[in-house]
Amino acid sequence: VNIFVTDPCPRKSAQVLPDKHVVKMPLETCQMLSIVFSHWYYDWGDDLLKKKDGTPYKTSKGAFRNHPCTQWAAKSLYNTAWLIQHGCALSTEYTHRYGKEHGCRDTLWQAKKVFHRFSEKAITCYNYVEDYAFAGPDQFKYDTSIDTLTAYKRYISSKPWAASNYLRDPSRKPDWL
């Protein structure tokens, strides 16, 4: 589970991720949001987000609840809004690259509705996010000369497969890779 924040704008951050991340990150986003909405954090409900088959994501054991990215998402409504927008952007990016809807698309849009209903805030409040969590290797995590966005860019760049993982739309490959 990770978020890979490469830009303060959740849409731009999603657009520059490699194909591999665009495929797997929407599901991880749904899992994190289910925990954030549940009794582990906001206590809005344990079965608010449903999978494509209609069953809710399991929250009883609190998988991922102690992960730095989940904790970050639950730290403020602004962070939660950012993650929701990023998840929706990942879903849109998936459709752009693969020509079909991601299996988590409806759940991510459902998360946006849940957020509006329970927080009474506009989803655009993500603009007030002040920091981001980094979950990655120590060489990037403890480098005080760089910010979290740069740490994620360097982390992604360190993967030998990343530079060639823009097969669906090579124009999405960022200059920093």
Locations of the language-model features?
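Sequence termini and other peripheral, non-core segments
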Residues: 1-66, 70-177
